[in-house]
């Protein structure tokens, strides 16, 4: 990872290179880096653990995420890649929103930049906590030592190599994750007697393990499906669309990305189900279902291979941290410092400050992670919904609706974020996932406020028409 960071450093000469890789990513790197940045440790721990605990009824979230990711690639990716270049060659989402609506007040950039800065700092901190806990629980290493190792490696390649380093390392980490999720279920099924014996063993534990509706409700299924809506508003994922070489490569990237995601998710599901059969055959019990991937690795493989499997989990955690860290740095430098205080700042100054911002945000996140605070980990439970509801409808409508105004965009972001926070803190999330009311409220706010406020200027309308003409070619 550090070697990749060094090579990326040698190829980084200006702010666009540092924050967006000079829009030079190929389809494979774009696809796998987006996937690795998205999934984090949940793919190798949370999802197999859910399958081990509840069976296939936990798979609804996988279906929702796959549909959301597919729609994101199909409808958002080509349009965002085209429009960000038309709108002042924007290199951040807040910058795109300001340029898209010709916002001279800078409120859009300021508000969205602050939201990204605050929430992603906690998000990064939660990733650091996960890394420290992994070192502590698997290797018996002191939590704080593990924290320093994860933070040190991620900060080093992100700080020096910027977007290219993050994308290339995410690509490698995506391959490691994929290989691990194919290897573990295959070997597990081999040791449980093949597919037929494995299925029979699982049915002997609980015949309803294969009932996808077990313990679910209509609202529960809708809530799990709604996770897919979050993709439209995740800055660390959709920024990958802005960095691909050309719009023509997005179709290939979509196929690679969705293939990786679906096969990896299936591997995670089969790992959990295979774990049920393996443990039951041998009369074994497991205290923490989320460790089933790690435990199978320890039992079934040579220590060298086990080390590779553990590195896959670390790769998942690190890829998400680095992506979120860079987006946070970008907002701090491009959307707050340059936009508000130093519009004449040189690229050299901004790249230096970008690296400084990576270090500063990392230090703050490390301090927050030091005490292994459960409140920080709890924040992540609705941060996905917060970004999805505040940015998702705004990004979608900005790409499709000419009449949308800057005031509509601002209202959508504020109402979406506020609805998610209020809904979650009112204890209503068990009834319905906060993404749904947040997304709906944001969508309605954008529409009604845009209709009730002055239409976009002729310059903004002309830019939208130019973008539409390019898309139709």
From Swiss-Prot:
* Keywords, comma-separated and alphabetical: Cell membrane, Ion transport, Membrane, Sodium, Sodium transport, Symport, Transmembrane, Transmembrane helix, Transport
Q: Which CDD domains match?
A: SLC5sbd_PutP
Indicate how the chain sits in the lipid bilayer.
Answer: Multi-pass membrane protein
A single Pfam family it belongs to is SSF
Q: Name one GO cellular component term.
A: plasma membrane
Coiled-coil boundaries: none
Induction context: The expression of the putBCP operon is induced in a PutR-dependent fashion by very low concentrations of L-proline in the growth medium. CodY represses the operon by displacing PutR from DNA.
Biological process GO annotation list?
proline transport; transmembrane transport
Q: What does this protein do?
A: Catalyzes the high-affinity uptake of extracellular proline. Important for the use of proline as a sole carbon and energy source or a sole nitrogen source.
Q: What NCBIfam families does its record include?
A: Na_Pro_sym, sss
Protein name, per record = High-affinity proline transporter PutP
Q: Which organism is it from?
A: Bacillus subtilis (strain 168)
Q: What is the lineage of its organism?
A: Bacteria, Bacillati, Bacillota, Bacilli, Bacillales
């Amino acid at each position: 990872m550090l070697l990749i960071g060094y090579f990326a450093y040698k190829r980084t000469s200006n702010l666009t290179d540092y924050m967006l890789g000079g829009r030079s990513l190929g389809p494979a790197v774009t696809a796998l880096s987006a996937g690795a940045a998205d999934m984090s440790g949940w793919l190798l721990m949370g999802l197999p653990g859910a399958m081990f605990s509840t069976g296939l009824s936990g798979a609804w979230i996988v279906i929702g995420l796959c549909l959301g990711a597919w729609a994101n690639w199909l409808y958002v990716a080509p349009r965002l890649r085209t429009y960000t270049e038309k709108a002042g060659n924007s290199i951040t989402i807040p910058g795109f929103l300001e340029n898209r609506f010709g916002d001279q007040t800078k409120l859009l950039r300021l508000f969205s930049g602050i939201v990204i800065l605050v929430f992603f700092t906690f998000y990064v901190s939660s990733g650091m906590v996960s890394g420290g806990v992994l070192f502590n629980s698997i290797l018996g290493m002191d939590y704080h030592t593990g924290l320093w190792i994860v933070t040190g490696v991620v900060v080093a390649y992100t700080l020096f190599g910027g977007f290219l380093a993050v994308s290339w390392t995410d690509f490698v980490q995506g391959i490691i994750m994929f290989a691990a999720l194919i290897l573990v279920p295959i070997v597990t099924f081999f040791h449980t007697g093949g597919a037929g014996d494995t299925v029979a063993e699982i049915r002997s534990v609980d015949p309803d393990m294969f009932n996808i509706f077990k313990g679910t409700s209509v609202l529960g299924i809708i809530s799990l499906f709604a996770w897919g809506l979050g993709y439209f508003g995740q800055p660390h994922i959709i920024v990958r669309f802005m960095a691909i070489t050309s719009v023509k490569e997005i179709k290939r990237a979509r196929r690679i990305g969705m293939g990786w995601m679906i096969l990896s998710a299936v591997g995670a599901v089969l790992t959990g189900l295979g774990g049920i059969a393996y443990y039951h055959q041998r009369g074994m019990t497991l205290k923490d279902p989320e460790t089933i991937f790690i435990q199978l690795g320890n039992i079934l493989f040579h220590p060298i291979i086990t080390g590779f499997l553990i590195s896959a989990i670390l790769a998942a955690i690190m890829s998400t941290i680095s992506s979120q860290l860079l987006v946070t740095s970008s907002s701090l430098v491009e959307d707050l410092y340059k936009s508000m205080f130093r519009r004449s700042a040189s690229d050299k100054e901004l790249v230096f400050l970008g690296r400084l911002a990576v270090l500063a945000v990392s230090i703050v996140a490390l301090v927050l992670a030091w005490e292994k605070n459960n409140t920080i980990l709890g924040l992540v439970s609705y941060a996905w919904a917060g970004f999805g509801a505040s940015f998702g409808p705004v990004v979608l409508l900005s790409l499709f609706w000419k009449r949308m105004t800057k005031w509509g965009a601002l209202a959508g972001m504020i109402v979406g974020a506020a609805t998610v926070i209020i809904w979650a803190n009112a204890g209503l999330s068990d009834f319905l996932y906060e993404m749904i009311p947040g997304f709906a409220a944001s969508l309605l706010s954008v529409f009604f406020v845009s209709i009730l406020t002055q239409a976009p200027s002729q310059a903004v309308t002309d830019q939208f028409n130019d973008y539409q003409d390019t898309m139709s070619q």
